[in-house]
Amino acid sequence: MGCDDKCGCAVPCPGGTGCRCTSARSGAAAGEHTTCGCGEHCGCNPCACGREGTPSGRANRRANCSCGAACNCASCGSATA
């Protein structure tokens, strides 16, 4: 998985320490577990407007997290598809 705004990384990813998405693999069959440097899972919404505990609808669903009603950051703005 590449770095993106959902993980708090610069887009496009500059590489090196500027990119905070890291992957830890524990075997090829185990798949890939991706986290940000701050400990958040990539794909979740780290923006300051916060999260809702339960997705309020399919449009706001983002993996295991969801964007709050007041969210308008880049991660949430693309959640309308």
From Swiss-Prot:
Alphabetical list of InterPro entries matching this protein: Metallthion_15
Q: Which GO terms describe its molecular function?
A: zinc ion binding
UniProtKB keywords: Metal-binding, Metal-thiolate cluster, Zinc
In its UniProt entry, the species of origin is given as Triticum aestivum
Does the keyword 4Fe-4S feature in the UniProt annotation? no
Please describe what this protein does.
Binds 5 molecules of zinc. May have a role in Zn(2+) homeostasis during embryogenesis.
User: What is the protein name stated in its UniProt record?
Assistant: EC protein I/II
Stated induction or repression of this protein's expression = By abscisic acid (ABA).
Q: Which Pfam families does the annotation name?
A: Metallothio_PEC (PF02068)
